[in-house]
Amino acid sequence: MFRVKVLVIFTLFATVAFAKNDSTAIFQGCSGGMMGHVGYLFGHPADATLPTGEKISPQGMTYGLGGSMRVHLWKHLRVGMEGFSSTMKSGVSDQHDFLQDGSYIRTGWGGVIADACWRLEKIWPYIGGSVGGGAMRTLSVVEGSQDDWLAEQVAVLHKQGFGYINPYLGMDYCITKRIHATFRLDWMLAFSNEQLVFPTGPRLYIGIMFCH
């Protein structure tokens, strides 16, 4: 009876140890952090109509902040989620002579991400993409000023949802084993049933990732 108990305990121990080793082979760690970005927002299509009759499609520099979290699986696969916010102000758009200060296009989006990463000594190049959705808020002030408390007579405020596919490539630079500087370039491909500006264009991200 004692031998049977020992055999059962040994078998259970071996099973748990094997499962642990197998899990370790699959799970290679995790990472997460924040990234700032700058990019260019293309207006598409050009049919946002103001009360004055003009059709506009603002384009210009956009900037913002966000972050991502990933689980590292097997040798190369990383999966996780991300979320970002980005703002284009009228002063850095091609409509700065037409739109008043205070006009902006603000975009927020988030989704799931997956990429392939090659863990070299100091450099970890990666390529992948994300899929998700978001919303874009557009404020176009044609007459008036943001410096007073008067009601604006000619302005448009609009909010629209969208879905997106976002291919990207980049690399991590291993500052230490736990801390990586990350650099990423992507191009958001947005789609929506509505006929206003879509948040389409390239962005360059720079940030810090904490790895475990």
Functional labels for PLM-detected ranges:
Residues 19-74, 211-212:
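Short glycine/proline- and aromatic-enriched beta-strand/turn motifs that initiate or cap beta-hairpins
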Residues 71-149, 173-175, 210-212:
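Gram-negative (and chloroplast) outer-membrane scaffold detector with strong preference
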Residues 1-28:
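Cleavable N-terminal export/targeting peptides
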Residues 28-36, 77-81, 110-112, 125-131, ...:
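Transmembrane beta-strands of outer-membrane beta-barrel proteins
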Residues 88, 165-212:
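Predominantly the C-terminal beta-signal and adjacent terminal strand-loop region
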Residues 28-30, 59-65, 104-110, 123, ...:
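Residues that define the transmembrane beta-barrel architecture of outer-membrane proteins
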Residues 48-55, 95-103, 150-157, 190-195:
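Extracellular loop and loop/strand-boundary signature of outer-membrane beta-barrel proteins
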Residues 41-49, 87-96, 144-152, 182-188:
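Flexible, solvent-exposed coil segments and beta strand-coil junctions
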